[in-house]
C-alpha cells in the first residue's frame, strides 16, 4: 500500500521510463554521445519536474486532509496549523467568530485552508525547488524544513540533495523558457535526475506519514506486514 499521491507519481513515472526506452531504441546503449536525441532528454527533464511538483502538492493535500479527518482535537495540531487558525480568526471582524472553532469547528477552518492551498498551487509552486517545497509542507501540514529529511547515510547529505534538486529545476526552467540551453542535456542528466526525484518522493512521503501519525495516531497508509 502507498499514498494516493505515490500511486499517481508511479503511474506518471512510466512516461519517463518510456522516454528513456525510446532513447535506447533509437540510439542504442553503447557508450558515446547521441546526436539528434536531445529533445527526448529535454522532454524528460521537464516531465520529471512536473511530476515532482504534482507529487509534493498531492501528498501535502493528502496529509492535511488526513489531519482534518483524524486528529482527535485541536490540541493535537502542529503549531503551524494552530497559527493558521489563529490568523484566520484575526481576519474576521465579528466578535463571535471565535465560537466557530468550538468543539470540532476547527476542522472546517482547516478544510478551508486546504481549499486555499489548492487555489494557490498554480501561482505559487511553479518552481519546486527545495525552499518552495519546505514552505509548502510547513504551511500545509506543519512540517518544519521537509528537505532536512532528504539524506541517505554514506551516500548523500540533505544539503547536497537540495543543491542537486535546485540545479535540475533550474535546468528545467531554462529548457521551458528559452528552448535552447547553454549546456546540452544528456541521457545521464535524465537518469540521474529521475533517480534523485524517486528517492526524494520516498523520503518526502515517509516524512509526511510519520508526521501525521504523530498528530493523529493513524498512518496515512496502512503498514504492509510481510506474509
Walk through the language-model features, giving the residues of each:
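Hydrophobic alpha-helical segments, especially transmembrane helices
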Residues: 42-43, 54, 173
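Charged alpha-helical initiation segments
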Residues: 1-46, 58-65, 70-79, 83
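Helix-loop junctions and short alpha-helical segments
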Residues: 47-48, 55, 60-155
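Polyanionic, low-complexity intrinsically disordered segments
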Residues: 1-21, 25, 138-227
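Short alpha-helical interface elements
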Residues: 41, 69-92, 190-193, 197-201, ...
Amino acid at each position: 500500500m502507498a499514498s494516493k499521491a505515490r500511486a499517481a507519481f508511479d503511474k506518471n513515472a512510466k512516461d519517463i521510463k518510456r522516454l528513456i526506452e525510446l532513447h535506447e531504441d533509437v540510439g542504442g546503449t553503447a557508450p558515446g554521445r547521441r546526436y539528434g536525441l536531445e529533445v527526448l532528454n529535454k522532454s524528460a527533464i521537464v516531465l520529471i519536474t512536473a511530476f515532482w511538483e504534482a507529487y509534493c502538492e498531492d501528498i501535502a493535500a493528502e496529509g492535511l486532509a488526513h489531519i482534518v479527518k483524524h486528529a482527535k482535537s485541536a490540541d493535537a495540531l502542529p503549531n503551524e496549523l494552530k497559527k493558521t487558525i489563529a490568523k484566520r480568526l484575526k481576519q474576521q471582524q465579528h466578535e463571535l467568530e471565535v465560537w466557530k472553532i468550538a468543539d470540532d469547528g476547527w476542522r472546517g477552518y482547516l478544510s478551508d485552508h486546504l481549499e486555499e492551498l489548492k487555489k494557490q498551487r498554480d501561482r505559487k509552486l511553479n518552481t519546486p525547488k527545495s525552499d518552495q517545497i519546505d514552505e509548502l509542507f510547513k504551511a500545509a501540514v506543519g512540517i518544519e524544513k521537509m528537505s532536512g529529511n532528504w539524506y541517505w547515510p554514506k551516500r548523500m547529505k540533505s544539503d547536497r540533495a537540495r543543491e542537486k534538486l535546485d540545479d535540475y529545476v533550474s535546468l528545467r526552467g531554462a529548457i521551458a523558457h528559452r528552448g535552447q540551453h547553454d549546456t546540452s542535456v544528456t541521457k545521464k542528466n535524465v537518469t540521474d535526475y529521475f533517480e534523485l526525484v524517486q528517492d526524494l518522493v520516498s523520503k518526502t512521503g515517509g516524512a509526511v506519514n510519520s508526521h501525521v501519525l504523530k498528530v493523529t495516531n493513524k498512518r496515512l497508509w496502512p503498514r504492509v506486514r510481510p506474509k
